C-alpha cells in the first residue's frame, strides 16, 4: 500500500444556492466525496485510513486542502484521483439529490 494523506474541505459557498438546505447538501456531498475518494484511492493501491472530507458552513475554522503521498509519482497520481473523483462525485451528487 502507498501512504497517502488527503484533507479536503467543502465550503458552503462552493455548494451553490439552488439547494433548499445548503448545510444538508454540503454534509451529504462531503460524505459522498469522502466515500468515493476512499474507494478510488484504495483501488489504486493507496492506504485510505487518512483520507477525509469536511463540510464547513462558514469560512471560519477551515484549513487549506492537502494531498500528500510519500513519493512524487504517487502524489501526482493521488492528485489526479482527487481531481477526477471530485468532479464525478459532484455530478453524481447533483443528479441524485435534486430534492435537497
What are these regions (language model features)?
Residues 7, 36, 83-86:
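Arginine residue identity/basic-tract feature
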Amino acid at each position: 500500500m502507498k501512504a497517502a494523506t488527503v484533507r479536503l474541505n467543502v465550503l458552503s459557498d462552493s455548494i451553490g444556492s439552488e439547494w433548499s438546505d445548503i448545510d444538508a447538501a454540503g454534509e451529504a456531498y462531503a460524505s459522498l466525496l469522502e466515500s468515493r475518494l476512499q474507494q478510488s484511492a484504495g483501488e489504486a493501491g493507496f492506504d485510505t485510513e487518512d483520507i477525509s472530507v469536511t463540510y464547513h458552513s462558514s469560512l471560519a475554522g477551515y484549513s487549506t486542502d492537502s494531498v500528500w503521498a510519500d513519493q512524487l509519482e504517487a502524489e501526482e497520481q493521488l492528485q489526479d484521483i482527487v481531481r477526477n473523483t471530485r468532479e464525478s462525485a459532484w455530478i453524481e451528487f447533483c443528479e441524485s439529490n435534486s430534492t435537497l
